[in-house]
């Protein structure tokens, strides 16, 4: 009888841990300051894939705030990275998701080998110096804070119109195991 109770407790504990583990692996929707930073630098540098005008007032605010920085040294540097290393499209976001900011400066949180292969030609420390120069000179964190209400409204709309209908239990059903990664929609 004692063995049965211990086994039952163990199985209950295992089930609870599995539920916690799966909850941690659920897809989270969030706004990211570093994703916005990299997108806006790319837009300011004229990357066509980042110049779509479908953001309404936010696009207008971006143009108003950052248009004075079109000749900024970081913007010129990013244009050179596109020309010489092919940093564009998904490579921009590959870097963005490996960055972190504390509101004062931007830091690299990954390993260079984690980045999209086009970044292998880039000196990351030099890139960070330039990125932080843009971040500081443009008062990017202030811009980001001023648009929190907009980001929250977009996240809420996404939750209500997409995530509400997205069945996240497909992963273990398809692969046969629980995901061990963190999935984020940024």
Locate each region found by the language model:
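Bacterial Sec-dependent N-terminal signal peptides
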Residues: 1-28
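N-terminal mature-domain "stem" immediately C-terminal to a signal peptide or N-terminal signal-anchor/transmembrane
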Residues: 26-106
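Acidic/His-rich structured neighborhood in mature extracellular/periplasmic domains
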Residues: 71-186
